């Protein structure tokens, strides 16, 4: 996993650069921007619907924990850039419960998940 995370840390620099470009374009065009972090079903916790340990679940070649750690690198970049640039962000990764009723796979949302996200979004939008 260490080598994978090292590669992702390199990619994170390009990701940050892209986020900053988006912010610059929006500011230049007077567009209100809100970033959202990406939730993932897997990671720490037990799925309340299935009883599945979301850390140990094997998805492709990585465990739930490994997938969660990889995505967290990118979510942390969003959080950091939003603080530094004073851009609003809604931390869906922290606000959306880890419950399979909200997902139809590891990161794509079910209809119920989309409804929940819209609720979280409007509760937190400034």
Regions found by a protein language model. Name each.
Residues 37, 93-94, 113:
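A mature extracytoplasmic/lumenal domain signature
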Residues 1-79, 97-100:
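Serine-dependent acyl-ester chemistry module
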Residues 31, 86-87:
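Short glycine/serine/threonine/alanine-rich loop segments
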């Amino acid at each position: 996993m260490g080598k994978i995370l090292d590669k992702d840390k390199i990619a994170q620099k390009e990701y940050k650069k892209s986020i900053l470009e988006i912010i610059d374009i929006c500011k230049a065009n007077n567009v209100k921007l809100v970033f959202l972090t990406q939730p993932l079903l897997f990671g720490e916790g037990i799925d309340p619907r299935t009883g599945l340990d979301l850390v140990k679940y094997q998805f492709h070649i990585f465990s739930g924990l490994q997938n969660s750690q990889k995505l967290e690198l990118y979510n942390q970049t969003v959080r950091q850039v939003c603080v530094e640039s004073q851009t609003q962000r809604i931390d869906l990764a922290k606000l959306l419960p880890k419950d399979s009723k909200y997902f139809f796979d590891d990161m794509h949302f079910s209809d119920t998940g989309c409804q929940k996200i819209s609720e979280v979004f409007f509760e937190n939008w400034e």
